[in-house]
């Protein structure tokens, strides 16, 4: 288990990087965030959580929510029902690409790009009577924090700027790979992205990825095999088009969001969440990646 002093040192060492990235501005509600925030939290498989910096300040988790939605789908569907509609390969295109959807006849490359996450949201909408409420129940239970909520301002802001995601959904619908009402699914999807959580919440919530599918309270959420498979997908496709660089520098399965958060896991040991709102050119937290690289090096840990 790393000590708090180590996490504080990691935060201090990356602070000079502040100012080198750019806060996401295509969602107006995200553009107003203080770019100088830095936080890190670690939860070990014995249930202990420590943190440093702004690790208790909530932020918009954005695409990190795609891990929760895929996990929820895995508890509701046979795997063939999921993987017949979305692939398992890295994209190589931007996370909101229409071109790839067209070229591959409506089947998204993986569940962590927007097209793939929209298919997963469509699956959840088909199977659940109240998909937004069910997601909130899940993340509150996983993080053991019943104050986790949706940021309605962010969800509304995303909906008002949803033309591209709507285009992706309608394009997939034209290929027969989208069943529900596009507007309804989009509203659910944007609420998932607008979950507000802090680094401590997320490191606790993602512990099942490090603990063979078992949550903080010991409940089996998904199987050991499913957990291994999910971590494999995170290692290859969790960081948009920066997955290779992240694997090289950090060496952990991970998932980023344009809110500046990144979650990562060392299977069998710990889950970690970092947050710094300034992004690199790939849309991943610049200082966040550096914090994970520092932590990986200091602990001498990598999955490779």
UniProtKB/Swiss-Prot annotation:
Q: Please name the source species.
A: Shewanella oneidensis (strain ATCC 700550 / JCM 31522 / CIP 106686 / LMG 19005 / NCIMB 14063 / MR-1)
Gene of origin?
A: glsA
Sites where the protein binds substrate: 63, 114, 158, 165, 189, 240, 258
Q: What class of enzyme is it?
A: hydrolase
Per its record, the protein catalyses: L-glutamine + H2O = L-glutamate + NH4(+)
Which segments of the protein form a coiled coil according to its record? Answer: none
Protein name, entry field = Glutaminase
- GO terms for biological process, alphabetical: glutamate biosynthetic process; glutamine catabolic process
Similarity remark = Belongs to the glutaminase family.
One Pfam annotation reads Glutaminase
């Amino acid at each position: 288990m790393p000590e708090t002093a180590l996490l504080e040192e990691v935060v201090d060492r990356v602070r000079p990087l502040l100012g080198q990235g750019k806060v996401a501005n295509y969602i107006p509600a995200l553009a107003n965030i203080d770019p100088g925030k830095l936080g890190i939290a670690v939860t070990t498989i014995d249930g202990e959580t420590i943190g440093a910096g702004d690790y208790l300040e909530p932020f918009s988790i954005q695409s990190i929510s795609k891990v929760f939605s895929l996990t929820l789908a895995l508890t509701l569907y046979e795997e063939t029902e999921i993987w017949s509609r979305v692939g398992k390969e890295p994209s190589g295109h931007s996370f909101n690409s229409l071109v790839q959807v067209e070229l591959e006849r409506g089947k998204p490359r993986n569940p962590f790009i927007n097209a793939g996450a929209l298919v997963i949201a469509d699956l959840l909408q088909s199977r659940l009577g109240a998909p937004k409420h069910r997601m909130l129940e899940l993340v509150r239970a996983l993080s053991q924090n019943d104050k986790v909520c949706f940021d309605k301002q962010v969800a509304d802001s995303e909906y008002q700027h949803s033309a591209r995601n709507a285009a992706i959904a309608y394009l997939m619908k034209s290929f027969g790979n989208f069943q529900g009402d596009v507007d309804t699914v989009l509203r659910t999807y944007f609420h998932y992205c607008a979950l507000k959580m802090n680094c401590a919440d997320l490191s606790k919530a993602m512990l099942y990825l490090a603990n063979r599918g078992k949550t903080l309270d010991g409940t089996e959420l998904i199987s050991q095999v499913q957990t291994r498979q999910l971590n494999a997908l995170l290692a290859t496709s969790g960081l948009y088009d920066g997955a290779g660089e992240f694997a090289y520098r950090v060496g952990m399965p991970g998932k980023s969001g344009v809110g500046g958060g990144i979650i990562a896991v060392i299977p069998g040991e710990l889950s970690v969440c970092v947050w710094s709102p300034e992004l690199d050119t790939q849309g991943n937290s610049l200082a966040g990646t550096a914090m994970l690289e520092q932590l990986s090096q200091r602990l001498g840990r990598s999955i490779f």
